[in-house]
Design a protein with these regions (language model features):
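Residue-level signature of mid-helix packing/kink "hotspots" within the transmembrane helices
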Residues: 38, 88-96, 146, 180-181
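Cytosolic juxtamembrane N-terminal segment immediately preceding the first transmembrane helix
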Residues: 1-43, 55-56, 71
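Cytoplasmic helix-loop-helix junction between adjacent transmembrane helices
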Residues: 137-176
């Protein structure tokens, strides 16, 4: 990119934009997305299937009632393991798709679309009538998450101050385990007192303002013309 191109790019940046604001926004998005991962891993949300678990004696297992998500849908631990990991299908399909779409569609807009998909997926989880529908919603969440996973790193690469790119990426990815841990705590509290459906519903509400901001704000363009390799790096 020539100096003239660089100056033209800077002039096109929206008024709300600054590199630090973008980093803060992406950190909030990462936390909100990975709170969902913690929620689905929370013991209060997962619950226990009817018949108890293998640590209980035979009489206790016979009288044990299920609770939480496993109890409501009569899901055993193996099936719940599938539920926890099925989002990867959506992530693996969505990441290269969003990467290629960023060549013709504004990448910031694609992130907004992904956040909307995650919010819809979490709302669908809260309203799921059966386990199969819940699996579908988890895949949709994976697709939505893929937009951020694929495109956030190229934005940081574009706008981090000189010599700070690695540090800024570390800040972004530090939000991943923080979001998961926060989701486990949040899911435990809400799942215990209000039920597992409210835990997913609350996470959908958390995503709405982030989606609204990204969808309605003047979008930012990626400086890079070819984002495919950066997207692959960002995915991991």
């Amino acid at each position: 990119m020539t100096r003239a191109d660089d100056e033209s790019y800077v002039e096109r940046l929206p008024k709300w934009f600054s590199p630090k604001r973008l980093l803060c926004l992406f950190c909030l998005v990462a936390i909100a997305l990975y709170v969902d991962r913690g929620v689905v891993s929370s013991a209060a949300v997962s619950g226990q299937p009817p018949g108890g678990n293998d640590d209980q004696d035979a009489s206790s297992k016979a009288n044990a009632k299920g609770y939480g998500l496993q109890g409501d849908f009569n899901v055993d631990y193996a099936e719940y393991g599938v539920l926890q990991s099925v989002f990867v299908i959506g992530l693996l399909v969505g990441a290269p798709v969003f990467s290629e779409l960023s060549r013709s569609v504004n990448a910031f807009t694609l992130i907004a679309i992904g956040l909307g998909a995650c919010a819809v997926g979490d709302l669908g989880c809260a309203l799921s009538p059966n386990f199969r529908f819940l699996l579908l919603m988890r895949i949709i969440i994976g697709v939505g998450e893929a937009s951020f996973v694929a495109l956030a790193a190229p934005f940081i690469d574009d706008h981090a101050p000189k010599g700070m790119k690695t540090r800024w990426l570390s800040y972004l990815y530090l939000c991943v385990p923080f979001g998961v841990a926060l989701g486990i705590v949040y899911g435990g509290i809400v799942g215990t007192y209000l039920g597992w459906r409210f835990a997913f519903f609350g996470n959908a509400l958390l995503l709405v303002p982030l989606f609204a901001f990204c969808a309605t704000s003047e979008p930012i363009d990626l400086r890079k013309e070819d984002t495919s390799m950066l997207a692959i790096i960002g995915s991991y």
